[in-house]
Amino acid sequence: MNKAVQDTQTSYDRVAVEYGERFKDEMDDKPFDRDCLNRLVRAAGELDPICDLGCGPGQIARYLHSQGVKTLGVDLSANMIVEAQRLNPEIHFHQGDMLSLPDADNSWGGIAAFYCIIHIPREQIVNALREMKRVLKPGGILLVAFHIGTEIKHLDDWWEKPVNLDFAFYLPTEMASWL
């Protein structure tokens, strides 16, 4: 595990409980995100499960599950997995690094990767996307959400807890070229 991945994991482990409490119901206030997820569900059709990659406390997995979709969640942070399972006991969650997922080839019908790639260094984005492609079933659908721009924002403190997190912004044209 490289330092950037390790720092991301440690940082989210530190803030998992607070993050879960603050964001567990965020989908209620995000009609655009819900619409994107509904389109993912329709496009995936009978292909399942759909994975909430970088699931955090599982708010996206919960929304997908509420739409009648077989859903699972994967996150780098063990403490986030604990929170996700606590908040959503009916959904399966497991730990995984999107640069080296523990899941078998062709095992997911769809992926909702909402704002998780923002912690992947630019030079590793293609590797993460290849790994996502590896676990997608033929005809599977990938939905990626990210911040638009070129900057990298850094956070040393989050809710009075020490963290070491970079948030990378990407241009749609560069993301399209990687896909």
Describe each region flagged by the PLM.
Residues M1-G45, T150:
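Conserved class I S-adenosyl-L-methionine
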Residues P49-L53, P57-S100:
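Class I SAM-dependent methyltransferase SAM/SAH-binding core
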Residues L99-I111:
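A short acidic, Gly/Pro-enriched loop at the edge of an enzyme's catalytic core
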Residues G109-Q124:
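A short SAM/SAH-binding and catalytic strip from SAM-dependent methyltransferases
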Residues G139-F146:
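Conserved beta-strand signature within the Rossmann-like core of class I S-adenosyl-L-methionine
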Residues I148-D166:
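Short, glycine-/aromatic-enriched active-site segment of Class I SAM-dependent methyltransferases
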Residues F167-L179:
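Short alpha-helix
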